[in-house]
UniProtKB/Swiss-Prot annotation:
Belongs to the TRAFAC class OBG-HflX-like GTPase superfamily. OBG GTPase family. Residues 4-162 form the Obg domain. This is GTPase Obg. Its cofactor is Mg(2+). It comes from Amoebophilus asiaticus (strain 5a2). Monomer. It holds the Pfam family MMR_HSR1. GO terms for molecular function: GTP binding; GTPase activity; magnesium ion binding. It comes from the Bacteria.
Length: 334
């Protein structure tokens, strides 16, 4: 997917339909000179509904859509007939989409399942017709209720990708090559920074028919948690990940510890919850270093760090990597 096609945030003014007005009406029947009130109620205004669609992967289809307004309910009619309800608007969104109130920042809806439908804004109720206002002392009421206003406001739709495992690292750490080597995903791979401009997802096959979803995030830079580079736009996508993979290239032996510390700093600065997620350190591009450099790296890293060395080119360490990920995803199997 081209970067200009991947839209993960849109802001929209949305308005549910207003309820239709109740009507003032009296029976007109032959041989009944004083027919009573029979004004019907107004119809309900249409709702604004979000619906999950697993075939979608971006909010691009909503980016250029103008104000979204549902249909108003119709007026009540004589004969105690209720007006027609307004047609609701169903907005299909990718799984992982949340709707937030722009003013408060509160999450209104969280779409995580295919076919899930949740009302974002409710349409107004229809007003009551004059049939409801007849009393012993008022046999011919000449008033009815207007319909209620539908809910409205500015909202932000925000896509947070659904993947169990997230690859996090600085540019050229080998994340895209790893994703391509263990899944059917075809990310763009090149020897220059920021080749990956949008998140890429791949399904990784595991033992006995099991699998997990791995997400390759664009490379971050120091200060990403403060918005530098691609910044928080893509850090937010790993909020749903259950396990984080911190990747560092083996050909930068001298700076391994500093790079690892910098990655942790960015995670913690963005969110304490991200920092607390289960994680594993992966040293990639093992094929570019010798046995002595591997030993040196092991000595440099604190012993408590769970680390695995891999080469996406030769395949060395990839099964061990998948085994470790599976254990982190399923701690109950230990």
């Amino acid at each position: 997917m081209a970067s200009f096609d991947f839209i993960d945030e849109v802001k929209k003014y949305v308005q549910a339909g207003h309820g239709g007005p109740g009507v003032v009406h009296f029976r007109r029947e032959k041989f009944v000179p004083k027919g009573g009130p029979d004004g019907g109620d107004g119809g309900k205004g249409g709702d604004i509904i979000l619906k999950g669609n697993k075939q979608l992967s971006t909010l691009l289809h909503l980016k250029y859509r103008k104000h979204i307004v549902a249909e108003d309910g119709k007026s009540g009619e004589g004969g105690c007939r209720t007006g027609a309800d307004g047609t609701s608007i169903i907005l299909e969104v990718p799984l992982g989409t949340v709707a937030k109130d722009i003013d408060s920042g509160n999450i209104l809806v969280d779409i995580t399942e295919d076919g899930q439908q949740t009302i974002l804004l409710h349409g107004g109720r229809g007003g009551q017709g004059n049939v409801h206002f007849k009393t012993p002392t008022q046999q011919a009421p000449r008033h009815a209720q207007p319909g209620e206003s539908g809910e409205e406001g500015w909202i932000k739709l925000e896509l947070k990708l659904l993947a169990e495992v997230g690859l996090v690292g600085f540019p050229n750490a080998g994340k895209s090559t790893l994703l391509a080597s263990i899944s059917a995903a075809k990310p763009k791979i090149a020897n220059y920074p920021f080749t990956t401009l949008v998140p890429q997802l791949g399904v990784v096959a595991y033992r006995e028919g099991h699998s997990f979803v791995l997400a390759d995030m664009p490379g971050i830079i120091e200060g990403a948690s403060m918005g530098k580079g691609l910044g928080t736009r893509f850090l937010k996508h790993i909020e749903r990940n259950r396990v984080l993979v911190l990747m560092i290239s083996a050909d930068d032996t001298a700076n391994i510890v500093q790079t690892y510390t910098s990655l942790l700093k960015e995670l913690k600065s963005y969110s304490e919850d991200l920092f607390k997620k289960p994680r594993i350190l992966v040293i990639s591009k093992l094929d570019l270093i010798g046995a002595e450099e591997k030993v040196t790296i092991k000595k440099l890293l604190p012993k408590q760090i769970d680390c695995v060395f891999i080469s996406s080119v030769t395949g060395e360490g990839l099964q061990k990597f998948k085994d470790k990920i599976w254990k982190l995803l399923h701690p109950e199997l230990k």
